[in-house]
């Protein structure tokens, strides 16, 4: 298990990290949320806000690189089997390793009133329901080396004042930056569409969700907390 400096815990409502044996180990087909104890299973079908029936074969596998990460090779997806709440302010802070390719989901909350978050979609490397759109290069490059086959720390936030993205702990000016729908809700998806398609094929490290908009200092704190592990 990797142990590093503290991440931000104020407002933390969800956290998974394959570097923690309390969350996930080699051979597991589910992971355990380290904050509220929610089960996280292989995404299957389109459960909306009802009961999710997991597909164990669709859960990412354990990869020992970087102290332990979730490996989505071949296309995998996670369903959070619990209710993360309907919010008016939220943040997602995570380590991503994007494999080459066209559109893939980072997250999707549309099973229960949330919004999609896509990569390499409509000529943007990161696109949070068109409310926030960001490119690592200008013009858009689907194979941008700053994003593809490279570990990147990303924090996105939204509240009534708008949305922001931080890349490797630094604020990055994005297109639009209007407020998103901050709901996570029931059966929130990581790495797949709410109907289980266009799945992530790279890797993901630690993944943290908050019921607040992280500040610039807090986004930097989360990056610094584990940069020696991933970079």
Question: What kind of feature is each model-predicted range?
Answer:
Residues 1-7, 71-92, 138-146, 192-196:
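Short surface loop/edge beta-strand patches of beta-sandwich-type extracellular domains
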Residues 137, 166-169:
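Short strand-turn-strand beta-turns centered on an Asx-Gly dipeptide
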Residues 150-164:
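Localized edge beta-strand/strand-to-loop motifs within extracellular or lumenal beta-rich domains
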Residues 26, 31, 35-44, 51, ...:
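Extracellular glycan-recognition modules
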Residues 1-74, 220-231:
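Extracytoplasmic low-complexity segments
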Residues 128-153:
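Short, aromatic/His-centered strand-loop micro-motif at the edge of beta-sheets
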Residues 1, 81, 133, 140, ...:
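Extracellular glycan-interaction patches encoded by glycine-rich segments
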